Amino acid sequence: MIGMSRASKQSRSMIQAFLVAVGGAIGSVLRYYVSQLALRIAGPAFPWGTLTVNVVGCFIIGVFAEMIVRRFDASPELRLLLITGFLGGLTTFSSFSLDAISLYERGATVASAVYIAASVGLSLAAVIGGLALMRAIL
């Protein structure tokens, strides 16, 4: 940002923050709806909603990483909107952690361990799958 005035830097920063906020709002609302749907379908015994949004979000970040970052040299603004904002709002490590501890504290030790292993394993596999899909297509 050499040569940019202080006002220009502040304006750019505000636009970037706005893009993150918009993407985050959309991702957060989608996470809410997915969690509510999972709760209605599967009930409250296991955190299917959090697992779903985290795994899907990991697949999408694999797709986005290959497609918009590496292949199409996306603008920093598009990256902020989609990766930092949307996927940051959609996925949730804090809810995953709380869900795992809640299962454990309720005495569902095996379910907690399965949830942790499934979350980490499936999420990593989803990123790899997203990357591989885009590499095969592009």
Q: How would you label these PLM feature ranges?
A:
Residues M1-L138:
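Membrane-interface helix-loop junctions in multi-pass transporters/channels
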